[in-house]
């Protein structure tokens, strides 16, 4: 008898009386999927008895596990598992060790086992690959791409549970813009749209009335709704906040002695922004009250991730504050050396973490605080020994201080990478540092990214299954059990063939999987037996191109959107374009009025993003190694799409069509990034030229680049108008500096016009652009 037949014959579904919402969720979904109107009954432990026609769905605590042992059910000796059993009475059991693995097991049942013989899945027991897979900085659910059009939050959260994730962040602003007030000409207030602080959801006795009640209520409502959905599917809800974040000056005017550190960026911000001094007991009580209020609303909150020293947040007297070490009056007196200040600053950081951990633990005893270490390079030596129980870190590497990159690009060993899919290995030495923290019950959540963020933002659904697998395998080989996936997953209704995250799901359910076999089976499911090999071949070509690409600083991370690369003109002298004609993109660009990035793509504020030599190396290697496999992939997908359509194989035609348009979009992205590298090199080379021939060569490079970029814009417009799939993140409401909107094609037309009008201008850079001053009296 097949599993589907047994399910239709189920007369009663039994779940624990004192259980989890996910058990009831699964019971209802399962009965609905097999058109069975059986009753769902809640029973206590004594009711878990094998009976014909019964189906048990449960998370198994130790007490219940002992009882089930007597039913003849076998369990893993490990802590993390899921099982599907049919016993001698044809009683079915869907069980897991943790609530967040139960839904994964359920989807395995309905997606893979329905047509199997019951005897073949008599006792399916699977140990889980990673104890924790935490979502961090989820673009779509909580962060700056939450405006994405037609977003189905429940379907998205359900997909997390299906994939085998365990923890997700749930705090997001309900409005498109934060409450933070800015100053004309600066770019700073917008940064408060992501990782919203505790005071965006609740008020304390200290800051009552600072934010409008309706603003806090709407944010809290969204947080609670996200948390409810997380719990519905068995996930642990938590928070990601920039803290201690700046507060409105009106609060500091009322309590001037509570002024803490200046935490803004003096180039990007046109007014000083200060937070509260967390060394003061009143401020500590304020933070405790905020967190406890939130947890009374959502007692199941399991963690709070704290990012800091950026985006209007920072810890007092830490070295990486943008204006340098500074803070309130209570930590250390003046004229102390750097080491003494670092020691006190580290103690203050840990005290804050422990304060919040203990506050959260009053309601949820397992509550954890998680932070990043990069920002604390000046305090790391003092901070590390103080990391303690349930004070965790999330990292790209435990071996470095600050933002150093020590991992080689998978194809180019001379290029160092950090954080993206290109960081596909893990050094043996990471294990020792991780084990040291584990011995204190302090976890290390290692970053990885198989979505668009840090890889191909704003594109959706770009496949690189082998790179994805290699990082997971590296984690497993080093004994890593806790992960943090950066950037969110692909929304399932927009990316029906989310190859990379499917690899994660398969690995989570089978850490010893064979990647070639896994990719082949996935292709078989998507395209059918006749076309599976061809689909794998297309993926292989796309990944070959991805591996051959060289990242370009923030442009390969988020800068295509933030710096508006897709829609800003790449011309020899950007400064020659009148400001009024540049406004269509500069008004939504992450930049202040005097940022040299407005006219020089190699710079951002005082950073040298991409040097001339690196830019030359990048576009040379891209031209040599990327285009052949990527063009082959595009042609391959188109050919197979047309062939499948011609014989009426709709299933295969759809997947080849989907991959064809995504590969074309990837080519457009890579061309713009490549052309950005050419611009950086050629404009500087022209200015540096000591003889006419060098200048002439640079000029020719620029001319060819502009031809390519104009053609690329037209290709993007064609993609926009013709593609039946959602290949790019697009806002459903307004354009912001972090997301494009429905006017994307119109902006590309404006770019083309400006490039055609200014392509003959002489290459030029003003090294003093940032010193320009309107109404300069001199």
Language-model segment annotations:
Residues 1-84, 116-123:
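Acidic, contiguous N-terminal accessory segments
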Residues 8-11, 18-20, 26-29, 76-286, ...:
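Feature activates predominantly on carbohydrate-active enzymes
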Residues 45-47, 174-175, 244-245, 374-376, ...:
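Conserved beta-strand edge residues that scaffold enzyme active sites
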Residues 49-51, 85-87, 128-129, 297-298, ...:
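Extracellular/periplasmic catalytic domains that process cell-envelope and extracellular macromolecules
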Residues 58, 92-96, 393:
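Short hydrophobic-aromatic micro-motifs
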Residues 285-290, 424-428:
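A Trp-anchored, charged/polar loop motif used as the substrate-binding/catalytic surface
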Residues 296, 339-778:
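Substrate-binding groove of N-acetylhexosamine-processing glycoside hydrolases
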Residues 319, 324, 328-334, 340-343, ...:
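Structured, solvent-exposed acidic/aromatic patches
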């Amino acid at each position: 008898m097949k599993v589907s037949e047994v399910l239709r014959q189920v007369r009663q579904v039994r779940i624990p009386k004192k259980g989890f919402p996910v058990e009831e969720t699964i019971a209802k979904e399962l009965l609905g999927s097999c058109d069975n109107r059986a009753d769902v009954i809640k029973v206590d432990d004594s009711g878990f008895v094998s009976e014909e026609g019964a189906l048990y769905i449960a998370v198994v605590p130790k007490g219940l596990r002992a009882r089930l042992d007597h039913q003849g059910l076998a369990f893993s000796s490990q802590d993390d598992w899921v099982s599907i059993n049919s016993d001698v009475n044809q009683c079915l059991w869907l069980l897991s060790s943790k609530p967040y693995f139960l839904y994964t097991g359920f989807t395995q049942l309905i997606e893979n086992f329905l047509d199997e013989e019951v005897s073949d899945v008599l006792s399916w027991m699977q140990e889980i690959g990673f104890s924790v897979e935490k979502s961090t900085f989820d673009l779509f659910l909580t962060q700056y791409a939450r405006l994405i059009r037609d977003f189905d939050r429940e379907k998205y959260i359900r997909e997390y549970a299906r994939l085998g994730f365990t923890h997700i962040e749930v705090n997001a602003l309900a409005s498109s813009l934060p409450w933070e007030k800015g100053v004309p000409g600066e770019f700073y207030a917008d940064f408060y749209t992501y990782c919203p602080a505790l005071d965006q959801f609740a008020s304390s006795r200290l800051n009552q009335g600072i934010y409008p009640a309706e603003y806090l209520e709407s944010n809290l409502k969204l947080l609670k709704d996200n948390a409810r959905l997380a719990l519905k599917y068995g996930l642990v809800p938590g928070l990601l906040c920039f803290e201690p974040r700046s507060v409105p000056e009106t609060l500091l005017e009322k309590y001037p002695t509570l002024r803490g550190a200046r935490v803004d960026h003096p180039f990007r911000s046109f007014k000083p922004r200060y937070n509260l001094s967390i060394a003061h007991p009143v401020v500590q009580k304020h933070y405790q009250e905020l967190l406890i209020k939130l947890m009374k609303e959502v007692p199941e909150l399991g963690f709070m991730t704290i990012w800091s020293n950026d985006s209007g947040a920072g810890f007092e007297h830490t070295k990486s504050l943008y204006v340098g070490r500074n803070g309130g009056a209570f930590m250390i007196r003046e004229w102390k050396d750097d080491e003494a200040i670092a020691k006190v600053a580290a103690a203050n950081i840990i005290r804050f973490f422990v304060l919040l951990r203990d506050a959260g633990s009053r309601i949820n005893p397992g509550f954890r605080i998680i932070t990043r270490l990069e920002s604390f390079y000046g305090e790391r030596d003092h901070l590390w020994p103080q990391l303690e129980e349930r004070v965790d870190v999330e990292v790209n590497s435990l071996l470095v201080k600050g933002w150093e990159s020590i991992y080689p690009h998978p194809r180019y060993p001379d290029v160092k990478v950090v954080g993206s899919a290109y960081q596909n290995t893990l050094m043996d030495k990471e294990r020792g540092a991780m084990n040291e923290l584990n011995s204190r019950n302090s976890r290390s959540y290692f970053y990885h990214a198989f979505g668009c963020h840090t890889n191909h933002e704003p594109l959706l659904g770009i496949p690189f299954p082998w790179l994805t697998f290699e990082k997971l395998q590296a984690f497993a080989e080093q004994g890593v059990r806790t992960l943090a996936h950066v950037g969110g997953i692909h929304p399932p209704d927009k990316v029906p063939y989310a190859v990379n995250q499917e690899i994660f799901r398969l690995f989570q359910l089978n850490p010893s999987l064979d990647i070639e076999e896994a990719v082949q089976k996935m292709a078989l499911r998507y395209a059918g037996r006749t076309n599976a090999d061809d689909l794998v071949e297309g993926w292989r070509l796309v990944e070959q191109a991805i591996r051959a690409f060289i990242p370009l600083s923030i442009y390969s991370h988020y800068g295509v959107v933030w710096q508006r690369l897709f829609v800003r003109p790449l011309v020899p002298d950007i400064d020659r374009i009148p400001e009024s004609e540049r406004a269509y993109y500069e008004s939504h660009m992450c930049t202040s009025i005097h940022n040299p990035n407005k006219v020089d793509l190699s710079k951002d504020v005082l950073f040298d993003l991409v040097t001339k030599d690196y830019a030359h190396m990048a576009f040379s290697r891209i031209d040599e190694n990327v285009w052949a496999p990527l063009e082959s992939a595009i042609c391959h997908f188109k050919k197979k799409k047309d062939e499948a359509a011609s014989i009426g194989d709709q299933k295969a035609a759809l997947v080849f069509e989907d991959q064809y348009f995504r590969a074309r979009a990837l080519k457009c992205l890579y061309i713009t990034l490549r052309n950005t590298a050419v611009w950086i090199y050629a404009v500087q080379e022209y200015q540096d030229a000591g003889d006419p021939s060098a200048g002439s060569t640079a000029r020719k490079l620029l001319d060819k680049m502009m031809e390519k970029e104009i053609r690329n814009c037209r290709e993007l417009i064609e993609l926009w108008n013709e593609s039946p799939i959602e290949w790019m993140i697009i806002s459903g409401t307004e354009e912001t500096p972090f997301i494009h909107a429905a006017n994307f094609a119109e902006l590309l037309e404006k770019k083309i016009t400006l490039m055609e009008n200014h392509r003959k201008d002489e290459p030029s850079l003003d090294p003093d652009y940032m010193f320009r001053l309107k109404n300069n009296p001199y």
